[in-house]
Regions:
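A short hydrophobic beta-strand segment most commonly corresponding to one strand
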Residues: 96, 110-129
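Short acidic-glycine-tyrosine-enriched beta hairpin
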Residues: 83-99
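Short beta-strand His + acidic residue motifs that chelate non-heme Fe in jelly-roll/DSBH
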Residues: 56-58, 79-80, 97, 102-109
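Short, conserved beta-strand element in jelly-roll/cupin
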Residues: 46-50, 61-79, 118-121
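A short, N-terminal "cap"/entry segment at the start of jelly-roll beta-barrel domains
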Residues: 1-43, 127-143
Length: 143
């Protein structure tokens, strides 16, 4: 999906370049926070990935509760848990990621992609950023 088509579908908007987390991504991503952390404990943001962009393997740790929910909103992308096959993502799909599961997500090679990222509240939560998804791993997924 090209950028012009994507922008028509991406109802939550591109947001700003995701510079604070750029070191954990291959390619460019954008962040549009939808909730104000000063007003609620539930953080929701629209995350947009340019074609080929993906985040590093990472883990949302929690003693209890925690994890992340991805709600796919535009374009097409990938989600993969360690040791499992990648899942092709399209608008309307919801991925529930339990706490303490190593995973990554991002755009397909030839498509922009966005999802809402919902950080699930929990006890003693933290994020651990791990190694990048290699080009070899990513290229095996195809289009």
């Amino acid at each position: 999906m090209n950028k012009q088509e994507f922008e028509k579908e991406n109802v939550f908007g591109l947001g700003e370049p995701n510079v604070n987390f750029a070191k954990y991504f291959i390619g460019n991503s954008y962040l549009n926070p939808l909730t104000d952390m000063n007003k609620t404990s539930l953080f929701i943001a629209n995350v947009t990935f340019e074609p080929g962009c993906r985040n590093n393997w990472h883990i949302h740790h929690a003693k209890s509760g925690g994890g992340q929910i991805l709600i796919c909103t535009a374009g097409s992308g990938w989600y993969q848990e360690e040791g499992k096959d990648a899942i092709s993502l399209t608008p309307g799909m919801v991925i529930t990621i339990p706490a303490n599961v190593k995973h990554w997500h991002g755009a397909k090679k030839n498509s922009w992609f966005s999802h809402l990222a919902v950080e699930v509240p929990g006890e003693e939560t933290s994020n651990e950023w791990c190694e990048p998804v290699t080009n070899e791993e990513y290229d095996r997924l195809g289009e």
